[in-house]
Amino acid sequence: MGVTSENVAEKYGITRDQQDAMAIRSHSRAAAAQASGRFKDEIVPVPTKVKDADGELHEVVIDQDDGIRPSISMASLAKLPAVFKKGGSTTPGNASQVSDGAAA
């Protein structure tokens, strides 16, 4: 998917700044939607156990998209390197997550 992003950006003249700005808008909108409960019917709460720093197990419920980054900025995105093509413009901050998906 990252290489395709690079190819599309090159073909249509989409700059790194444009990609970063869109990433900020997307995460901001997603954060607002999640905060207002718009995703509640799309995310099934999953109880699980996690270990804390001391190795203690705690039960938690995963009920939100953890990929939303509401605090990203142009400055923070500018620090990330292109990862799919040398001299490219697609970074971990403006690309789609590779961890998306679920199984039932």
Where are these predicted regions, by residue range?
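Conserved thiamine diphosphate
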Residues: 1-24
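N-terminal extracellular/periplasmic Venus flytrap/periplasmic-binding protein-like
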Residues: 18-104
